[in-house]
Amino acid sequence: VIHEHRVLNPATEELVATVPATTAEEVAVAVTRAAAAQRTWAALAPADRARLLRRFAVLVDEHAERLARLEVTEAGHTLGNARWEAANVRDLLDYAAGGVERLTGRQIPVPGGIDVTFLEPLGVVGVIAPWNFPLPIAAWGAAPALAAGNAVLLKPAETTPLTALRLARLALDAGLPEHLFQVLPGSGDVAGNALVEHPGVAKVVFTGSTRVGKQIMARCAQRVKRLTLELGGKSPNIVFADVDIEAAAAAAPMSFLDNAGQDCCARTRILVQRSVYDRFLEHLVPAVASVAVGDPSDERTQMGPLISRAQLERVRTLVPEDADGIRGSAPGGPGFWFPPTVLTGIAPDAPVATEEVFGPVAVVLPFEDEDDAVRLANATEYGLAGSIWTRDVGRALRVSRAVRAGNLSVNSHSAVRYWTPFGGYRQSGLGRELGPDALAAFTETKNVFIGTEA
């Protein structure tokens, strides 16, 4: 039995903290306390709940630099990214607070009376956050769930619990009821399973691998428990010949090197029309070489380390040592470093071209025409994100509709905004997070008919 988890700085391998591991018994106690706090929270006037969430957002803003530095230390994120993530949490809390007083039902015309619907909170929601974006993704589940009147039990990843613990402290300082937002550090096998299987938890929100997501889905099925799953990805970056090839090549590296490639939206399959394939690669070489890899606390750094030695070994295993391609540089010495890598001459069905590597690795594959591009783009089990580079508006719309993925960008690699929906097709998940309907995903619809005929 693991009683505590060691948090390491992935850039230095130094011990940052040891955090007690939550037991199954402690999860059960937390659920009971959360249920009581949720009743108090749901009974508050909507304006009061919104005010407290806005206060929470203000405190996150005041502590943004400390949160960002924690994210750098425990997750290896670059300082620029970590600052964006802290701001994203602040903005999402504000956005969710704005929805509290707008979470309305409907009046539906019926004969013989009045029919109305109510959106009621589920109760206690379990949020299982990943290690790749521990701070913002924790808020993606927690903020709308709280805004809809629920309590939240957040289980962070074993390697990255520190920002979650700080968020819970800020929630208390903001005046949210005690036990309404609790953080339960621990292993997936113990704390995670206890959260998923507890009958008092009405919904589970999980972000992580497709393999673990399937296990959670099976456990939720035993109790017909609601769930949202944001899982893996192997997203395409489709470059047509009519686009500015130099601009497309310059934009490509950070579409898969952001967070050292540990991003489910990473555009790790670069599909380039054959007529411009060689020219694209010529421009891609200097673009990859120019990416600054190093100390994530340095404001000039664009890419930091992988999260752990285990992740480093997984990436090494999936990347063929003798493959042709483009390789950037990475620091030697301590830390979990892997250089930016672009592979060419890879078969479209090779593991590195179809499986989620979750590292700074992409493959470049040629395609002939629009139909061939769509076929290649859809030739994985995933469907989370993708980019389409073209000057032809008609083609952009046709390909956007034909690619089986939930989040597509044209002439851009943007995938996540807190005010637009986010989620995947196929093996990339179930449900949507963020956006204008985020709060409704944490409610039940109740229909009430009131007869008016004597």
Segments and roles (model prediction):
Residues V16-T22, A37-A43, V127, N237-F240, ...:
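Short, well-ordered beta-strand elements within core beta-sheets of diverse protein domains
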Residues I2-H5, R267, L384:
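Short loop/turn microsegments at loop-to-beta-strand junctions
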Residues E13, A34, R49, E71, ...:
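Residue-level signal for inorganic ion chemistry
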Residues V1-G113:
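N-terminal Rossmann-like NAD(P)+-binding subdomain of aldehyde/semialdehyde dehydrogenases
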Residues A35-Q38, A42, A57-A64, A68, ...:
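Structural signal for hydrophobic packing residues in well-ordered secondary-structure cores
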Residues T12-T18, V201, I238, A292, ...:
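Conserved C-terminal structural/oligomerization subdomain of aldehyde/semialdehyde dehydrogenase
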Residues G105-A247, F367:
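Rossmann-like NAD(P) dinucleotide-binding subdomain of oxidoreductase/dehydrogenase enzymes
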Residues R211-A347, V410:
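ALDH superfamily catalytic-core signature
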